[in-house]
Amino acid sequence: MGGGWWWARAARLARLRFRGALLPPPRPRSGGARGSFAPGHGPRAGASPPPVSELDRADAWLLRKAHETAFLSWFRNGLLASGIGVISFMQSDMGREAAYGFFLLGGLCVVWGGASYVVGLAALRGPMQLSVGGAAAGVGAVLAAGLLWACAVGLYMGQLELDVELVPEDDGTTAAEGPDEAGRPPPE
């Protein structure tokens, strides 16, 4: 049960999609088209792209789902490592030192999964048949998930928590002996 089959499929789709851009332009066979860069000249003038078949749509959908599954796997592993960090954080002082390692491991998993998702999304947007808006929504969702994870871990470790301590000011002078605002005498 290998997991690398979809990389081969993604590479094939990318090769088919970018083959025209990577190959050198064909040389003209007749001298009539030489030197003309105006649109409307040449053998492919007015040729529309081939229609997208159901098989192409299914391939794009499968590639998107495999790509999202890879990110979710990394994110799940990051959450699992962070959960182990929370458990060890509560154990003892030695557990707190181990917890920082688990939080770091969880962060590496979340960051690596998010970065590989964003890079893969940028590289395979064409074969996935994603619009720019769809790709931007995917990137936004990944960034939001990573930010929520970072905020949760930061709040748990107390890094973002503000400790406000109310300390009465004592400048060395005592209040005048006399009744307070309610008219009661001072305590003895």
From Swiss-Prot:
Residues 1-96 form a transit peptide. The modification Phosphoserine is found at residue 48. Residues 29-38 have a biased composition (Low complexity). It is found in: Mitochondrion inner membrane. It is a multi-pass membrane protein. Residues 25-52 are annotated as: Disordered. The chain crosses the membrane at residues 102-122, 135-155. GO terms for cellular component: mitochondrial inner membrane. Keywords: Membrane, Mitochondrion, Mitochondrion inner membrane, Phosphoprotein, Transit peptide, Transmembrane, Transmembrane helix. PANTHER family: TRANSMEMBRANE PROTEIN 160 (PTHR16236:SF0). Belongs to the TMEM160 family. This is Transmembrane protein 160.
